[in-house]
């Protein structure tokens, strides 16, 4: 069976319709992300759509979140990094633009530390959480 890298428009439309019916405001964008994450596996699409329609955050469904221009891997049990948290990164950079060390305690996914390290360049990064 040939592998299709691009889902058919009807598949995208069907996924978007299901997501929209479940209350997802950006259903088309979410459908694109789910279809890309599923990589052509119809079973994976079905599982992801079911999980998203049940209310699981999109980032946990696809396994990553965009934060500070980077893809941060996420999984259940870790808070999903949110765009509004990027404000914290901006403030830290404004207060210490030449920092040589970053300490990210209770780091969760490590998004804040990773974003700071990426922005600062050569930095000594220490990130820790309870798990």
Predicted features and spans:
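A short N-terminal interaction module
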Residues: 2-46
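A residue-level detector for conformationally permissive "hinge/kink" positions
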Residues: 15, 47, 61, 100-102
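Aromatic-enriched hydrophobic runs in primary sequence
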Residues: 21-23, 30-31, 41, 46, ...
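Secondary-structure boundary/capping residues
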Residues: 27-28, 61, 101, 125
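Conserved AdoMet
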Residues: 28-94
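Conserved SAM/SAH cofactor-binding pocket of Class I
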Residues: 84-131
């Amino acid at each position: 069976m040939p592998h299709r890298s691009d889902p058919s428009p009807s598949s995208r439309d069907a996924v978007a319709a299901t997501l929209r019916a479940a209350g997802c405001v950006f259903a088309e964008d979410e459908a694109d992300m789910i279809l890309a994450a599923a990589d052509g596996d119809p079973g994976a699409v079905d599982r992801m759509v079911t999980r998203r329609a049940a209310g699981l955050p999109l980032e946990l469904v696809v396994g990553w979140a965009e934060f500070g221009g980077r893809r941060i891997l996420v999984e259940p049990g870790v808070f999903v990094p949110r765009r509004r948290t990027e404000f914290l990164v901006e403030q830290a950079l404004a207060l210490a633009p030449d920092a040589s060390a970053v300490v990210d305690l209770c780091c969760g996914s490590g998004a804040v530390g990773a974003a700071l390290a990426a922005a600062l360049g050569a930095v000594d990064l220490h990130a820790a959480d309870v798990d």
